């Protein structure tokens, strides 16, 4: 379907969990002839990342309120009003046919500005429990979409847009069929690393010995400390890296993943068709727990909460999963995945833009 001449503004910022799905949808629609601009903040990751993808970005000034001091709370209405005014000026200048909100603080003023300008707002919630901004915006949005069931009572479940190289991986039965030898355990801490994984996994390696081979991504600045921890328990055969540039290749190598359960990570693991042991980040909304729960319920993963995540517990779980079990879990993970999430979100964006065109034509 051609989007020739149609204009989209994507609002997303702060973290990769918001920005990467937005980029996936943006590229999909640009390939159909859409023009895309981005609304973000100048001091977060989108400021550098989005222009690298050939998308122009506009900035407004806004930051989060949770955990801020009394002066920040008192001045918040003024700052929000100013951010809405900035966003409205940008909307009037660019005149998008539709606005896609992917989360982050920028979506609040941006969504309100779009609504004030009569531009339809499509929202996408990546997590299993809705963020504050999206909960608020859902009341004025034309369409609300969710990656996992339960974030909103009536929203369509469309999954999270996932990178094409992960979607292109062979299905589990092809990938895992002829494997033998030690179980390949991929440990992913994210760009910042996860201290609980870095502290626990060397002990797990010592406990399980020759039964596993580990590829442990430790995060920024933790390489020498974690390497030393593996050496101290006589486990020097494992691969320890600070970052992983090619996650699709890492998923292809792995038999099982041990990681946090951020929304995008969970969606990628399902799309790849991989069993997982999740240790959710201890957030007051328990966001990561709710992200991981559908995979645990499907029999594709196990959740161990951080206070219970220790050498004995992790070793017991991993040693209980033989290759036949891992293949079954991998197939269950793939069955839960929504591999066409990008198409689904893009279709809803197109529909909302179409409804505005009809409305304007008949207005």
UniProtKB/Swiss-Prot annotation:
Q: Report which reactions are catalysed by this protein.
A: di-trans,octa-cis-undecaprenyl diphospho-N-acetyl-alpha-D-muramoyl-L-alanyl-D-glutamyl-meso-2,6-diaminopimeloyl-D-alanyl-D-alanine + UDP-N-acetyl-alpha-D-glucosamine = di-trans,octa-cis-undecaprenyl diphospho-[N-acetyl-alpha-D-glucosaminyl-(1->4)]-N-acetyl-alpha-D-muramoyl-L-alanyl-D-glutamyl-meso-2,6-diaminopimeloyl-D-alanyl-D-alanine + UDP + H(+)
The catalytic activity of this protein is classed by the Enzyme Commission as 2.4.1.227
The kind of enzyme this is, by top-level EC class, is transferase
Give the top-rank taxon of the lineage listed in the UniProt record for this protein: Bacteria
Function according to Swiss-Prot or TrEMBL = Cell wall formation. Catalyzes the transfer of a GlcNAc subunit on undecaprenyl-pyrophosphoryl-MurNAc-pentapeptide (lipid intermediate I) to form undecaprenyl-pyrophosphoryl-MurNAc-(pentapeptide)GlcNAc (lipid intermediate II).
* Signal peptide bounds: none
Per the record, GO CC terms?
plasma membrane
Quote the InterPro entries the UniProt record gives: GlcNAc_MurG, Glyco_trans_28_C, GlycoTrans_28_N
Gene Ontology molecular functions: UDP-N-acetyl-D-glucosamine:N-acetylmuramoyl-L-alanyl-D-glutamyl-meso-2,6-diaminopimelyl-D-alanyl-D-alanine-diphosphoundecaprenol 4-beta-N-acetylglucosaminlytransferase activity; undecaprenyldiphospho-muramoylpentapeptide beta-N-acetylglucosaminyltransferase activity
Official protein name in the record: UDP-N-acetylglucosamine--N-acetylmuramyl-(pentapeptide) pyrophosphoryl-undecaprenol N-acetylglucosamine transferase
Q: How does it sit in the membrane?
A: Peripheral membrane protein
Q: Where does UDP-N-acetyl-alpha-D-glucosamine bind?
A: 15-17, 127, 163, 191, 244, 263-268, 288
Q: Which PANTHER family match?
A: GLYCOSYLTRANSFERASE, UDP-N-ACETYLGLUCOSAMINE--N-ACETYLMURAMYL-(PENTAPEPTIDE) PYROPHOSPHORYL-UNDECAPRENOL N-ACETYLGLUCOSAMINE TRANSFERASE 1
Source lineage: Bacteria, Pseudomonadati, Pseudomonadota, Gammaproteobacteria, Enterobacterales
Report the sequence similarity comment from the record: Belongs to the glycosyltransferase 28 family. MurG subfamily.
So, what pathway does this thing act in? Cell wall biogenesis; peptidoglycan biosynthesis
Its annotated compartments are: Cell inner membrane
């Amino acid at each position: 379907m051609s989007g020739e001449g149609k204009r989209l503004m994507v609002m997303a910022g702060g973290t990769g969990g918001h920005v990467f799905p937005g980029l996936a949808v943006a590229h999909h629609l640009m390939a159909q002839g859409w023009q895309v601009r981005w609304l973000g903040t100048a001091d977060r990751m989108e400021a550098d990342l989005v222009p690298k993808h050939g998308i122009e970005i506009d900035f407004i000034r806004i930051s989060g309120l949770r955990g801020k001091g009394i002066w920040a709370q008192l001045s918040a209405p003024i700052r929000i009003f100013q951010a809405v005014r900035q966003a409205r000026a940008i909307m009037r200048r660019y005149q998008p046919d539709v606005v896609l909100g992917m989360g982050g603080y920028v979506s609040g003023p941006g969504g309100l500005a779009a609504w004030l300008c009569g531009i339809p707002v499509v929202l996408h919630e990546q997590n299993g429990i809705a963020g504050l901004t999206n909960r608020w915006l859902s009341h004025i949005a034309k369409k609300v979409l969710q990656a996992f069931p339960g974030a909103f009572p009536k929203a369509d479940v469309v999954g999270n847009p996932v990178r094409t190289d992960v979607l292109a991986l062979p299905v589990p039965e092809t990938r895992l069929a002829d494997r033998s030898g030690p179980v390949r355990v991929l440990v992913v801490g994210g760009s910042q690393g996860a201290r609980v994984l870095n502290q626990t996994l060397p002990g797990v390696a010592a406990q399980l010995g020759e039964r596993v081979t580990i590829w442990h991504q430790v995060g920024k600045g933790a390489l020498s400390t974690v390497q030393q921890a593996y050496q101290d328990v006589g486990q020097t055969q494992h691969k320890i890296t600070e970052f992983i540039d090619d996650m699709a290749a890492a998923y292809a190598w792995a038999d099982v993943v041990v990681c946090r359960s951020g929304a995008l990570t969970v969606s990628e693991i399902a799309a790849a068709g991989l069993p997982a042991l999740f240790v959710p980040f201890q957030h007051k909304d328990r966001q990561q727990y709710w992200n991981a729960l559908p995979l645990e319920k499907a029999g594709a993963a196990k959740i161990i909460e951080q206070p219970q995540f220790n050498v004995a517990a992790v070793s017991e779980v991993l040693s209980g999963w033989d290759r036949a079990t891992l293949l079954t879990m991998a197939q269950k993970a793939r069955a839960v995945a929504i591999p066409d999430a990008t198409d689904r979100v893009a279709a809803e964006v197109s529909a909302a833009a179409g409804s505005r065109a009809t409305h304007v034509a008949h207005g």
